[in-house]
Amino acid sequence: MKILFLAFLICSSFLFPSSSFASHVELKPCVEIAHCVREEWEVNNIEKPFEEIKTFIENTPRTKIVEIDGDYLHAETTSKWMKYVDDLEVSFLPESNIISIRSESRVGESDLGVNQKRVDLLKSKMF
């Protein structure tokens, strides 16, 4: 019985990556500042911003939400001309009324400011 349970645990770790159980995820820091932006915003009511950000991302051209799990959202944005994919992550920390945003290019040394513009646009829609 113990072996069967252990086999189940091992198999389930491959089927369900740890990010699929995300709740109150601490977003990783930006390693390459030239193509990554990470910010934290304090808000009064965490529920309203979550829905606003989700709706904004759903309506953004060439952007698709690939994961929503609890207080974590991951979207992919594809550039219009070169078809580069950037990752946009949002984590909500309800106990502290903090929203963490992280936008990073997957390739290249510089994003020519695209990620900062994306985060600034999101922020302008929020506040």
Language-model region placement:
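Ser/Thr-rich, low-complexity intrinsically disordered terminal regions
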Residues: 16-127
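Sec-dependent N-terminal signal peptides
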Residues: 4-12
